[in-house]
């Protein structure tokens, strides 16, 4: 009992599991009550009923779970989370559990138990003791769980709840008094080094400076304006037995040439009037005008005549 670290005046939660004997459970609860005294309190809960209890959050200073020699239970994540909830910030948890040297269907290794405690929110997880099970305890666990191996140990672990509640916040004070020292100023560049990479305007008039005139590199043929026809590719728009067609993104002028030819062809196909007044309406049209009876239209506008109209004309 002295190894549990329970002090007078503390509120202690004692969790037990089957197959603990009622007499053993009563003696242990009375022993805890004598330690905490009248200023403290000991609450007893079954591990399977812990999640159904109505304990308020941050109630107990210490929780002792399944430490009786004749009790055995596997602490689930929900059970450990509930123990963390009812403990006060900084509260202590002491638990015992049967572990195995290899992964089993129900029992787990000590490393797995440590990981489960940390996932439940506990810190400072420490192994206090580890002992082999007695033949009677081993037989009872085999009967209850169906475990067939011999590598079973009873391990006692201690863990602590952090000094803060889940979801709590705290203001962080930032001090701007001690600022980081400013870096030393960069040295000024050497003027001689800068001159090596610059061409002074005064150097342009030096007789010793020999610059090449780019125009002198061109001959008379290079300066002549090229003939547009010479810029056209030899095979551009040429296809035996096919209509002349410009290339996509044409740059030789064939596309513009074909467009101009198309516009001129449309102009020649426009209907011609002998009097030149057909577009004004029936009042200005001749008796044999093919546009007779049609509304006025703009000069040059394309008008389609049906076969009946042409026959009547």
UniProtKB/Swiss-Prot annotation:
The lineage of its organism: Eukaryota, Metazoa, Chordata, Craniata, Vertebrata. Pfam families: Anamorsin_N (PF20922), CIAPIN1 (PF05093). A motif (Cx2C motif 1) lies at residues 275-278. Residues 173-223 are annotated as: Linker. Disulfide bonds: none annotated. GO terms for molecular function: 2 iron, 2 sulfur cluster binding; 4 iron, 4 sulfur cluster binding; electron transfer activity; metal ion binding. The gene is ciapin1. Belongs to the anamorsin family. A motif (Cx2C motif 2) lies at residues 286-289. It is found in: Cytoplasm; Nucleus; Mitochondrion intermembrane space. HAMAP family: Anamorsin. GO terms for biological process: apoptotic process; hemopoiesis; iron-sulfur cluster assembly; negative regulation of apoptotic process. [4Fe-4S] cluster binds at residues 275, 278, 286, 289. Its cofactor is [2Fe-2S] cluster; [4Fe-4S] cluster. It comes from the Eukaryota. InterPro entries: Anamorsin, Anamorsin_N_metazoan, CIAPIN1, SAM-dependent_MTases_sf. Residues 236-252 are annotated as: Fe-S binding site A. This is Anamorsin. One of its GO terms (cellular component) is nucleus. The keyword Magnesium does not apply. Residues 275-289 are annotated as: Fe-S binding site B.
